[in-house]
Amino acid sequence: MLQNSKAFGSFSTNNIEDAREFYGNTLGLNVKDNPMDILEVHFPGDSHIIIYPKPDHRPAVFTVLSFPVKDIDQAVDGLIAKGVTMERYEGFKQDEKGIVRSESAEQGPSIAWFTDPAGNIL
């Protein structure tokens, strides 16, 4: 029934202007305004997400968006240089940069978390 659908994700923010600045300028993503006061964030491969304003927004307590990168150190260093702080979580062995290092492909990728201005985990 939905196998040919181009699914997309969405999440809320408490301030659409802050979201536009963060996703567009801080992260350098392709952000487009939607006539419904919704942000569309477009990615390579014709995929996108939407970010919508919500007055009673509550930050997600789980990762809402993941960015696979070839060089996690370079990505984290670049984010830190733009003022982004890496999150630290109890129960994870994180290095001085806040990266959880994977030792093998079976363990999955190395991971670092940060939040957007609305507190959503990325």
Predicted regions and their residues:
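N-terminal beta-strand motif that seeds the catalytic metal site of vicinal oxygen chelate
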Residues: 1-20, 48, 62-65
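A short, glycine- and basic residue-enriched loop/turn
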Residues: 8-10, 38, 111
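Conserved short beta-strand elements that form part of the metal-binding/catalytic scaffold
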Residues: 29-70, 87-88, 107, 121-122
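Vicinal oxygen chelate
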Residues: 1-2, 67, 76-122
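Short amphipathic alpha-helices within nucleic acid-binding modules
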Residues: 22, 73-78
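Helix N-cap motif at beta-to-alpha junctions
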Residues: 15-16, 69-73
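Amphipathic alpha-helical segments
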Residues: 17-30
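A generic "structured core" feature
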Residues: 24, 39-41, 84, 93
